[in-house]
């Protein structure tokens, strides 16, 4: 999850890629529009959005069972926006990878 945060701060999708499995997905709403699909959509959005140098994050929950886990991340001031993310992770070849990200954009 730290690679994800680092990529958000740098504004470079490439910096967050290693946090995710290559087949990861993303789902959430931006306004009335469903933002859904392959995780590449997040990387592309992050590249367009730019650096979030003032981003503040807090992991508020972690639950691990064997080779699966969930993480809740609160992000404040991602270029002026506040997000709540839920990640599902899987340990793949000994490394934790984010398999899915669902998010809520606070208004």
What are the functions of these language-model segments?
Residues 3-7:
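Solvent-exposed, amphipathic alpha-helical segments
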Residues 8-11, 46:
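Hydrophobic residues in alpha-helical segments
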Residues 10-23:
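Short, well-ordered alpha-helical segments enriched in acidic and aromatic residues
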Residues 22, 67, 94-95:
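Beta-strand-connecting loop/turn residues
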Residues 25-30, 36-82:
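Surface-exposed, charged secondary-structure patches
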């Amino acid at each position: 999850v730290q690679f994800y945060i680092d990529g958000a701060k740098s504004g470079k999708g490439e910096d967050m890629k290693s946090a995710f499995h290559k087949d990861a997905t993303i789902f959430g709403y931006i306004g009335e529009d469903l933002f859904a699909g392959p995780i590449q959509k997040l990387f592309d959005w992050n590249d367009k959005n730019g650096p979030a140098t003032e981003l503040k994050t807090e992991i508020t929950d972690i639950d691990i069972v064997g080779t699966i886990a969930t993480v809740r991340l609160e992000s404040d001031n991602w270029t002026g926006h506040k997000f709540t993310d839920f990640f599902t992770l899987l340990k793949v070849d000994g490394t934790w990878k984010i398999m899915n990200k669902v998010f809520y954009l606070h208004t």
